[in-house]
């Protein structure tokens, strides 16, 4: 029988809970970057479309999903706060400007489509269309800047590493967005969307090289931090996934392309986690074992997460199943 005494005595089932929560934090971040990432990418692609019908198609494709996808950002923040409260406090106090910027961009991205649909006036829709694009581009850029600064332990919000990583994440969302729009909208969108996706994945690989080069100069351990076998394996896997993505997109295998984009997203987040570990707050030197909460709340949280996360995942399975398949001409945002 589980008792308070047993829960306070040691880790649940003798599991390495500190390391598991570290991995879970980054898995949640990767899930948000992928699921909301293709929404962001669709918003960026929206800027390249002149035809009103094509723009409405983009809005219809992401309409059922974008607000639900943002749940994963809340779960990420909640998990970081619950498991590593000192890290949460330090990160959010050092980078509060970035946090406000991310929230502002997310609000703009959510508000703009609603306002866009309220009036069919050219000037009105041009303004809110641009706002939608701005929110869709700024949100991943600022989130990437936050992740880059977190990795190198910079106390400043705007750095070279932040700009490079932010640009990398933004282009990665376009990669995901092109595959998602191909899957949901199909022939309702011009073929240029696929070409944008192929071009974006090439730019993404170039930015990955730029990111690794910047980290080699910025990280205290230098290039040695990037030459470990896990990092090299993740980079090689990313190259293979990028090639698979481009081939799949050209052949119209949009689901395969979207799966490849998911692999690229989780791979990028995994590189950050591997390079950072065992530290979780490089700015202060805190390592995972030092930053984790005490045994009793850690065990209770682990039980709660084991029960609740499958429920959240089930909700998303139901959501995506209910709105599966390509959108029809009758659907609107």
Regions found by a protein language model. Give the residues of each.
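Helix-coil boundary and interhelical linker segments in multi-pass alpha-helical membrane proteins
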Residues: 1-22, 80-96, 147-162, 217-224
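N-terminal signal-anchor module of multipass membrane proteins
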Residues: 1-68, 74-79
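Membrane-interfacial helix termini and the short, flexible loops that connect transmembrane helices
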Residues: 46-55, 83-89, 110-129, 183-193, ...
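Membrane-interface helix-loop-helix junctions at boundaries between adjacent transmembrane segments
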Residues: 90-100, 108-169
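Hydrophobic alpha-helical transmembrane segments in multi-pass integral membrane proteins
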Residues: 138-152, 206-217, 267-284
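Hydrophobic alpha-helical transmembrane segments
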Residues: 164-170, 297-315
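Internal helical hairpin/lid segments
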Residues: 218, 222-275
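Short, membrane-exposed interhelical loops at transmembrane-helix boundaries
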Residues: 281-300
């Amino acid at each position: 029988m589980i008792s308070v005494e047993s829960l306070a005595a040691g880790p649940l089932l003798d599991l390495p809970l500190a390391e598991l929560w570290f991995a879970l934090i980054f898995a949640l971040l990767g899930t948000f970057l992928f699921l909301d990432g293709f929404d962001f990418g669709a918003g960026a692609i929206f800027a390249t479309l002149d035809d009103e019908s094509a723009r409405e198609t983009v809005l219809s494709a992401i309409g059922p999903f974008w607000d639900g996808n943002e749940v994963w950002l809340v779960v990420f923040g909640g998990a970081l706060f619950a498991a590593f409260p000192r890290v949460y406090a330090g990160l959010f106090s050092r980078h509060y400007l970035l946090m406000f910027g991310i929230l502002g961009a997310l609000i703009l991205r959510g508000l703009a489509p609603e306002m866009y649909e309220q009036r069919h006036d050219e000037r009105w829709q041009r303004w809110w269309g641009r706002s939608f694009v701005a929110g869709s581009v700024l949100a991943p850029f600022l989130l990437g800047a936050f992740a880059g600064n977190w990795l190198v332990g910079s106390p400043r919000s705007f750095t070279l590493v932040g700009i490079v990583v932010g640009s990398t994440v933004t282009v990665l969302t376009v990669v995901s967005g092109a595959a998602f729009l191909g899957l949901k909208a199909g022939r309702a969108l011009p073929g240029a969307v696929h070409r944008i996706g192929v071009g974006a994945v090439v730019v993404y690989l170039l930015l990955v090289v730029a990111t690794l080069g910047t980290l080699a100069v910025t990280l205290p351990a230098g290039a040695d931090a990037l030459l470990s076998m896990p990092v090299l394996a993740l980079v090689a896997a990313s190259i293979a996934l990028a090639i698979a993505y481009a081939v799949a997109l050209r052949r119209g295998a949009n689901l395969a392309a979207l799966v490849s984009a998911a692999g690229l997203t989780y791979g990028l987040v995994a590189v950050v986690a591997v390079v950072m570990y065992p530290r979780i707050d490089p700015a202060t030197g805190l390592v995972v074992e030092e930053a984790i909460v005490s045994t009793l709340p850690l065990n209770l949280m682990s039980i709660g997460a084991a029960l609740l996360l499958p429920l959240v995942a089930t909700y998303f399975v139901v959501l995506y199943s209910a709105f599966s398949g390509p959108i029809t001409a009758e659907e609107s945002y």
